[in-house]
């Protein structure tokens, strides 16, 4: 498919549309953008993509699904996407988290207007796609849904949180290895402004880091799993693995989770519960100090996902994802123990 065009199939007829003149910057500014562009797209369309570049989404209960679809199906000027398209989606999805389940009808219509075929089951989806984005907002469903995908052998990206517990996270990796399916999971904040400079060694050896993000809660998930994971993902992107203990301090306005690494380094995550809500942090290096952030949208993560689908090379390793989840679970245990230090090895 030429990158300068979007081709749709309606019945047996092919329609060709000129590439949309708006940029991805316009897309990110507002989810309402879909109301500006979608009326120009014929109804009942089906997006067409090359064999080997067809992506399916599981879970239309999150804005990530709509954002990813807009980028891949409309932004034809981005050569990094290399013709990969979202061609089918299974809507469910959380059924008992109201803030998620009530979004499904609207997001389903949004992606349908972007040329995505809506299917009634994961099995039906798997017959139509080459790769899978497991986007279901409810981490409790990920293990069950992931196993169904793994049995098909399809390479999979699992959006945050990878699961709602450390036990389920371990089980997901175990099942992926059993069926020899490449997977990775990540928050988009891993690729925020400044992160690449840290990884490239611009400030030398990392001595410590402080990160922050909003901290919203969902009663069905441990506290940090729902939203705090964004800041925790940033922390581990900078610090790497090796955290041995976590201690959590709680106030009405904010929370502080302090991690001690095996080499003596200290990393902290600050969860913002009031005041200005944002994402960022500071990395402390041997030769410099670097500000992390601001958040720069979903596309940097999507670039990594497409590269992963093309090459099988994981941008985030299993050990780091497991430790991120262990850190968050240890923070929950610390809360239960009234702020006591919790060793990750004891989980």
Language model: regions and residue ranges:
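N-terminal Rossmann-like dinucleotide-binding module
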Residues: 34-110, 204
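C-terminal helix-rich "cap/oligomerization" subdomain common to oxidoreductases
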Residues: 29-41, 132-136, 311-347
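Interdomain hinge/lid region at the active-site interface
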Residues: 275-313
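Beta-loop-alpha module in the N-terminal Rossmann-like domain of NAD(P)-dependent dehydrogenases
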Residues: 116-173
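N-terminal secretory signal peptides and thylakoid transit peptides that target proteins
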Residues: 15-35
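Rossmann-like dinucleotide-binding domain that binds NAD(P)(H)
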Residues: 210-276, 319-322, 326
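N-terminal secretory signal peptides
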Residues: 1-22
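A contiguous active-site-proximal alpha/beta segment in oxidoreductase catalytic domains
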Residues: 162-221
């Amino acid at each position: 498919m030429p990158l300068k065009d979007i081709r749709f199939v309606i019945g047996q007829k092919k329609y060709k549309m000129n590439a949309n003149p708006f940029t991805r910057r316009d897309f990110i500014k507002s989810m309402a953008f879909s109301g500006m562009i979608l009326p120009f797209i014929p109804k009942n369309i089906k997006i067409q993509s090359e064999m080997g570049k067809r992506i399916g989404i599981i879970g239309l209960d999150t804005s990530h699904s709509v954002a990813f679809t807009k980028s891949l199906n409309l932004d034809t000027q981005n050569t990094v996407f290399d013709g990969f398209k979202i061609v089918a989606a299974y809507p469910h999805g959380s059924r008992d988290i109201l803030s998620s389940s009530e979004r499904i009808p609207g997001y389903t219509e949004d992606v349908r207007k972007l040329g995505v075929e809506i299917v009634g089951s994961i099995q039906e989806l798997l017959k139509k796609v080459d790769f899978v984005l497991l986007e279901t907002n409810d981490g409790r469903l990920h293990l069950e849904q992931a196993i169904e995908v793994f049995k098909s052998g399809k390479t999979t990206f699992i959006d945050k949180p990878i699961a709602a517990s450390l036990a389920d996270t371990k089980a997901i990796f175990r099942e992926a290895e059993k069926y020899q399916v490449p997977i990775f999971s990540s928050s988009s904040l891993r690729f925020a402004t400044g992160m690449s400079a840290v990884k490239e060694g611009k400030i030398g050896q990392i001595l410590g880091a402080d990160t922050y993000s909003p901290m919203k809660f969902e009663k069905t998930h441990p506290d940090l799993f729902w939203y705090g994971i964004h800041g925790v993902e940033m922390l581990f992107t900078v610090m790497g693995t090796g955290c041995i203990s976590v201690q959590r301090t709680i106030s009405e306005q904010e929370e502080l989770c302090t991690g001690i690494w095996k080499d003596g380094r200290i990393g902290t995550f600050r969860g913002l519960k009031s005041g200005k809500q944002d994402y960022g942090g500071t990395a402390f290096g041997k030769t410099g100090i670097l500000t992390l952030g601001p958040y720069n949208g979903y596309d940097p993560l999507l670039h990594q996902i497409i590269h992963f689908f093309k090459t099988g090379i994981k941008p985030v390793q299993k050990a780091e994802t497991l430790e991120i989840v262990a850190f968050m679970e240890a923070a929950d245990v610390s809360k239960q123990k009234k702020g006591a230090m919790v060793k990750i090895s004891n989980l």
